[in-house]
Amino acid sequence: MINDRFKIEVIKSSELSTFFQIYKPNIDYPKLQEIFSGTLELCYNQDDVSFTNVIHVCFDIKEQKYCALLNIGTTTDIDDIVSIDIEFLFVEKEYRKIHFEELGNIKLSEYLLIDYVVLTIGETIKNQIGINTVALTPATNKIRELYSSYGFQTIQGSGSKEAEDWMVFNL
């Protein structure tokens, strides 16, 4: 539980099919739908040890509905250094521009990226097993600018195309 308004749940791979019968993200861009489909394949493919992705969902207790989804795993795609990988972050449209008082007057996406992944998960993993970076690849340049304002840095030339360059947050 984050606070009285939101809680984050981890969905076990064995429960994904059942969960996505209950919650169908309202993905409003074709490119995001393509990324979402690809990211789900990573979660279902738990037999391959190179895939370590886990779905985390945010539930709005007040409104009694799911409002965001994260796919978090690990990657060695950046110079063979293990990083926490935010494979996918999706926030339902009606939650995107709101600064929530319950979250310290920040947007839900910022809370999920910085407070939840970087500060909660990232710091715990850093202290316990020594992974020191959180990595992601933004879907658009506009999102890249937003993540840059949160402290993520672009690693030029790290993607197959410039728009696919990795961004990292050093813990």
Task: Describe each region flagged by the PLM.
Residues 1-103, 111-112, 116-139, 144-171:
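Non-catalytic substrate-recognition and accessory regions of acyl/acetyltransferase enzymes
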